[in-house]
Structure formats: structure tokens, C-alpha cells
Design a protein with these regions (language model features):
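Conserved HGGG/HGGXW glycine-rich cap/lid loop of the alpha/beta-hydrolase fold
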Residues: 6-50
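Active-site loop/oxyanion-hole signature of alpha/beta-hydrolase fold enzymes
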Residues: 41-81
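Gly/Ala-rich beta-loop-alpha elbow adjacent to hydrolase catalytic centers
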Residues: 82-86, 90
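Flexible "cap/lid" loop of the alpha/beta hydrolase fold
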Residues: 95, 101-131
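Conserved alpha/beta-hydrolase catalytic His-Asp/Glu region
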Residues: 115-117, 131-184
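Short beta-strand/loop motif that positions the catalytic acidic residue
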Residues: 186, 192-194
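Acidic catalytic loop of the alpha/beta-hydrolase fold
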Residues: 196-201, 227
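Catalytic histidine-centered segment of alpha/beta-hydrolase-like enzymes
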Residues: 224-235
């Protein structure tokens, strides 16, 4: 797994895990806002642009990040955050290692498996994957995702770099993920965020995550769609981290 880093090496460690189909720039504004006070590490998840290996499973990505933390930071860090697929990987990390961080931020993580969605992914991408290489099609996707306009070049470049096999693999993994029973042993203070304008499955998932974690809080973000908090409102996200830590 490859990593992009910001900030001071001797400072408290914050690791942020990007959403599926995105990359480290998901958290670029957040990292720049926090870099004077923290050491920010942005892993590039397997199967994504600039990654060093294909995507296999959410569980394997979690294990890789745990190994990285064990190797470089004596088994624990200050805070880990994750969006969507990254949020699922974070939940898996917390399930595998209950005391790996002091704080955690789960944003828009799906934990209600859908076999119907799973079955549709391979046929859908088998027929339209080639269109991803065209800017007009990517702009339609980009607009639907509600990502701020200045990230389009990053989005187009990195989406084009994802293989069809990897894209199908991580989307299918995303559609089938459910919480492990061991999540209840997590000792971190967990903050769960979901946009008010997200779909019902995402809203229900946020409730399930909150109810499964004794030391957690849930905030529904008024007016926001999927992933908008960390992607489009990076300074607000960074300020929320400061508020959590100081509060």
C-alpha cells in the first residue's frame, strides 16, 4: 500500500482512508488544514490509482493498514477516519484491533449488505466501463457524485487509471459489507457522520454503527449528500476534528 503524507513527523498521527473510486485527494484540504499540528497519513487503497496492488477484500486492506501501524507506530495512532469504502475498512480495522486509535470518524459507511446491488455491478460495469475514458461521461458521473468542481481533473485522471476488475471488486465488496461482532469491543471514541440527503440504506447504516459502538455519537449533516463533508467541506471537517479532540 502506498501513502501520501503531510505535516510534522513527531506529531500525533492521523490516518484518513478515502472513498471508493477516489484517492488521497479526497482528504487533501483536510490534511492541509491540519498539517501544522498533526502528522497526516493518506493511504491509497488497493486497486486505486497510484496503488501498488489489486483490490482483494475490505478485510485485507484493513490488515495491511494494521500492519503498517504496527511497523511504524508501535501499534496505535491518535485518530483514524474513513469515508464510504474507507469507512468500511476503518470499521474492519476497529473490529480486528479494538485499541488501535484513540478517536475514529466514520463517514457514510454502508453496513447493510445488498445481494441485489452486488449482482448488478459486474453487468453494469461490463457494459459501460469503456465510457469512463470519455470526459463527457465522467463529468456526468462527477456531477451526480456532488464533488466540488476543482477536483474534476483528479477524479477523471484517477478513475481512468482504475482497472475494470478492480472497480468491480471494490464496488462488490462495498455492497456486501456488514459489521463484525467484534466491533462492540472497540475502545476508541467514535464519531459517526451521515448526510441528511443520503439514501435510506446509508441513514440506517449510520444508526446501526452508532448502536453497535458504546462510545460513539451520531451526527446527521443537514443539506449534505454522500461524502460531501470530507470532500467538499474539508476545513469544516478539520475543525470538527479539533472540536472532538478539545471537547
Amino acid at each position: 500500500m502506498n501513502y501520501v503524507e503531510y505535516g510534522k513527523e513527531k506529531s500525533d498521527i492521523i490516518i484518513l482512508l478515502h472513498g471508493g473510486g477516489l484517492s488521497w485527494w479526497n482528504y487533501e484540504e483536510v490534511a492541509k488544514s491540519l498539517q501544522n499540528d498533526y502528522h497526516i497519513i493518506l493511504p491509497i487503497l488497493d486497486g486505486h490509482a497510484e496503488s501498488d496492488k489489486p483490490f482483494t477484500t475490505i478485510e485485507n486492506n484493513a490488515t495491511e493498514i494494521i500492519t503498517f501501524i504496527d511497523t511504524h507506530f508501535q501499534g496505535s495512532v491518535f485518530l483514524i477516519g474513513g469515508l464510504s469504502l474507507g469507512g468500511q475498512i476503518l470499521l474492519e480495522i476497529l473490529s480486528q484491533r479494538n485499541n488501535i486509535c484513540k478517536y475514529a470518524i466514520i463517514e457514510s459507511a454502508l453496513v447493510i449488505p445488498s445481494k441485489q446491488t452486488y449482482s448488478m455491478i459486474a453487468p453494469a460495469f461490463g457494459s459501460c466501463y469503456g465510457l469512463i475514458q470519455y470526459k463527457w461521461f465522467s463529468r456526468l458521473q462527477f456531477k451526480w457524485l456532488k464533488i466540488k468542481s476543482d477536483l474534476f481533473d483528479c477524479y477523471f485522471r484517477d478513475t481512468c487509471a482504475i482497472s475494470k476488475k478492480d472497480m468491480i471488486a471494490f464496488l462488490q465488496a462495498n455492497s456486501l459489507y456488514s459489521l463484525k461482532r467484534t466491533i462492540k469491543n472497540c475502545t476508541a471514541r467514535v464519531y459517526v457522520f451521515v448526510g441528511r440527503k443520503e439514501n435510506n440504506a446509508m441513514q440506517k447504516s449510520a444508526q446501526i454503527i452508532h448502536q453497535s459502538l458504546q462510545k460513539s455519537s451520531l451526527q446527521v449533516l443537514t443539506g449534505l449528500y454522500h461524502g460531501e463533508f470530507s470532500i467538499n467541506h474539508g476545513k469544516d471537517y478539520a475543525n470538527k476534528i479539533r472540536e472532538m479532540i478539545e471537547g
